[in-house]
Every structure is written in C-alpha cells, then in structure tokens.
Amino acid sequence: MAALRLLAWAFSRRVSAHRPQPTLPHHLIRHYPTTRCGKVKFYTDPVKAVEGIKDGASVMLGGFGLCGIPENLIGALKTKGVKDLKIISSNVGVDDFGLGILLASKQVRRVVCSYLGENKLCEQLYLAGKLELEMTPQGTLAERIRAGGTGVPAFYTPTGYGTQVQEGGVPIRYSPEGHLITLSQPREVREFEGQHHLLERAIRADFALIKGWKADRSGNVIFRGSARNFNVPMCKAADISVVEVEEIVDVGTFAPEDIHIPNIYVKRVIKGPRFEKRIERLTTRDSPPAPGSKDQDPKRTRIIKRAALEFKDGMYANLGIGIPVLASNYISPKMTVYLHSENGILGLGPFPLKKEVDPDIINAGKQTVTVIPGGCFFASDDSFAMIRGGHIQLTMLGAMQVSKYGDLANWMVPGKKVKGMGGAMDLVSSKKTKVVVTMEHCTKTKQPKILEKCTMPLTGKSCVDLIITEKAVFEVDRSKGLKLVELWEGSSLDEVKATTGCSFKVCPNLKPMQQIKSDA
C-alpha cells in the first residue's frame, strides 16, 4: 500500500512537458522501475550512437525537408564513412545539408522517398545512373512505415490507382548511358465498395535516426511544433531507433499524456552537441514581394482571386504551394477555414513576422508559418489518415496537364524533370474531397495544358472537379468531359477554344470570371 500511495502522490504532482522541473525527488524515484528491460542507452558522441550501421544497411531518416532532421546523427554517418546505404526519407533535403550530405559523399545506393524538392544533386545522380530512386506517394510511404512498426505486413490504399504506381514502369535505376535498368513493379488491385485499391507492403529498416525535442532519462520522447512529421512512425519501424534531442530531462518531468513516443520504441538517445536548424524557405509577411515578381503577375492574381471563392466557412482545406497558398490571403476575416498541411499541421495561420520565425513550424512547401489559436500538430501518418479518410473537404493544387475527363499530371517529366509526387496522389485519392486545379492555361511555349489525354505520368485518374486558369473556369464531369462555366472578360470564346487541347461544352448561363473582393 505504501508503494501505491507513493505512486499516487507522484502522479498528482505531474506537470506539463513544457515545464522542465522534476516532479519527484531522485531518492524516491529509485524505489520503483522507470525503464523497460533492454534499458535505453544514452550517448554523448554521435559517432558512437550510430555504431552498428554497416555498409548496405537500411536507415530511416526522420524529418520533413529540413525540419526535424537528425542533423548530428547524419553528420556522424558521414564521419563513419559507411557506404551503399538504403535511405528511407520523406524528402532528400538540399544539396549541402541533411540527406544531401550523404549523397554528396557517395554513401547512398538507394533512396526511398516521396519528393526530391530542390535537391538538384539527387536528381543529377539519379538521371546519371549513380543512384537508385524509389518514388512513393507521401501518404503511402507514411502508412508503409506505420504498418512496419505495427506488425501489419501489407494494406490496401486508393492512392495511385490508374497511375504508374499501379501499372509499374517507374524508373528506379538508369545506366550511365541513360538506359533503363530497373523499373517499379505493378501493384495488385482489388475493389472495395466500388473503389479500386492497391496492395502496398509494409517497410522496416535496420536503423531509424530520429530528431526529438526532449527525452527523459527513461527514454520517453516529445517533439516540438511540426517537427513530429515522419519521426514518430519511423521511430517505431526500425530494429534500432536512435533519437537525438535538444535536452534530456529527469523522469517525471513529462506528464504521461504529453509523451509522444514511449520508451519501448527507443534504443539509444543522444543530446545533440549543436543544432543549426536551417530553414529551407524563410517566408515572412513583413517582406513584401519584389516588383515584377511572380506574386505580382496580373494573370496569377486573377487565378488567385477566383480560387479564393472556393473557400467556405468551417471548411477543412489543403493548399498546394504557389497559387493555392496565396489564395488563402483572401479568406474573409468573417470566415473560418481550417488549413491543413500534410507535414502535420491543422490550423495554418499567416506567414510569421521576422521576429516570429520558428524553424520547427513550417508548411508542406517548407515555408515558415504560424498556427492559429486552436490549431494542432500531429505526425505524418495521422495527417494522411485525415486526407485518405475524406476529412478534408477541399484540395487545391497546380498541374502540368489536366485531361478532358479530370486526369491530373503534375509530378514528373520522364528523363528531364524529377520532383516526385509528394502528397499529391494521396490528396486526390478520396472521393469525398473536391479537387480544384489552379494553373496558367498554356505552357511557356504556348502549348495547351488542358488536353484530350495527358501525355505525362498521371498523379490521379478522373480526380479533378474544377479547373481555374487566367482565361476561364471549367467544371469537370468525369464521364462527359469539360463544361466552360466562366470566361475572363479579356478573353473570347474563340481564344479559349484555340488554346485548349480538347473539346468542351459551353454552359448556357456562361458567366464572367468571378473575382473575390479584396476587402471581403
């Protein structure tokens, strides 16, 4: 009974994770167990913390872009000099930071990721036949990792149906001469409740290198801001998870309900000796766009002001980078729209002031952001559960091409441009989500972007509901095709027909292209 009274007293004294003082004296803590069997080991040297990672090992790297990456442990891998690594990561960072460091030192044989972003080195190595690259939709990657950590060998998802992910044939490896050597394999397809799904297999790794905010001395871990991202599911899906943190605190500092990763998933912990916490895209609202920039282009502004009319009060929406994000600037202050970011935020606010910039709070475009009161953070697997589950009412994104029947292509130009699909395939996979495409009507070479059939690899099949360009607005019927419903006053019907690569119907009640009022 005395022991029970002691424990009850300890729990009554617990505090929030944001208050670092201990809640129980050390001489009392020693009288009951605070760690599991197979005690978590603590390190001071990052190189020793990655002991056991050998040539050819599979390694998960937590983070999203440069946010929440285990930068000290990545540096230790470079120092250690292990080669032929298979890296599983959401993104590949930039050329000279994060995963880019290991690519530059030629230590990586294969990368499994969803998005290359601005890492030109990774793209060059891939196209030159010096790197294997397995592109996976971001939500599918998160779920494959989550499944690996929970003992589920495989699962079905609607993401990627009708694309090369399903059909196979996505280049994984080129020869130095540019010939295809390895291609992705087709997926098994089954139909559930009238919708096609792909079979995806779970993924595990030998090691996971994780970045947390704080750990207690029994190995429990908490994260800060949007740095939770892929760190949480990855920590659970490896034989050995190594967590670097900014601070190690006493047992009892965290209230049990505040712990994000229980110590059962953690094998090693190290307090990082230094953190650069580099920001990939510093964006603030007190830095106006330069004269002549894309943000002041009248064509883009026209699309933005029309796109803003798609927001409804109380809506949950996900916005792609560029025009969709800029459309959120026109949301009326009388309206509440909950903006979702696939890296783990619900309730995005405006870009920060310079003094408010926080490297642990970024959006899916790697831009610094703020979060509105009532907003929240979560891990990437939870984020894509919201997306695939149809809890997001609107997704707005750009496109390279859209077909007459709503097929979307926006992630790859074979042999030339390789960015990756990111979360786009997941975002367009739910039948409950309205998909709006915002884009310029033609390419820079004046070629139509609205076509009878897409010629580039698809992001989604029959998934687009509305197309907004600087010339017109089209509704998409996925069996009957396009209907022109709005026309910009400076454009003519003949001009739109001449610059559109497919036939379309004209609404009998054709309207001038609508624009939100700036003071709405």
Swiss-Prot record:
GO terms for biological process: ketone body catabolic process; ketone body metabolic process. Residues 1-39 form a transit peptide. Residues 280-299 are annotated as: Disordered. It catalyses: a 3-oxo acid + succinyl-CoA = a 3-oxoacyl-CoA + succinate. GO terms for molecular function: succinyl-CoA:3-oxo-acid CoA-transferase activity. Its main location: mitochondrion. Keywords: Mitochondrion, Transferase, Transit peptide. Pathway: Ketone metabolism; succinyl-CoA degradation; acetoacetyl-CoA from succinyl-CoA: step 1/1. Expressed in flagella of epididymal sperm. GO terms for cellular component: mitochondrion; motile cilium. It is an enzyme of class 2 (transferase). It comes from the Eukaryota. It is found in: Mitochondrion. The active site is at 342 (5-glutamyl coenzyme a thioester intermediate). Its EC number is 2.8.3.5. InterPro entries: 3-oxoacid_CoA-transf_A (IPR012792), 3-oxoacid_CoA-transf_B (IPR012791), 3-oxoacid_CoA-transferase (IPR014388), CoA_trans_fam_I (IPR004165), CoA_transf_AS (IPR004164), CoA_transf_BS (IPR004163), NagB/RpiA_transferase-like (IPR037171). Pfam families: CoA_trans (PF01144). Homodimer. Belongs to the 3-oxoacid CoA-transferase family. Key enzyme for ketone body catabolism. Transfers the CoA moiety from succinate to acetoacetate. Formation of the enzyme-CoA intermediate proceeds via an unstable anhydride species formed between the carboxylate groups of the enzyme and substrate. Probably play and important roles in the energy metabolism of spermatozoa. NCBIfam families: pcaI_scoA_fam (TIGR02429), pcaJ_scoB_fam (TIGR02428). This is Succinyl-CoA:3-ketoacid coenzyme A transferase 2A, mitochondrial. It comes from Rattus norvegicus (Rat). The gene is Oxct2a.
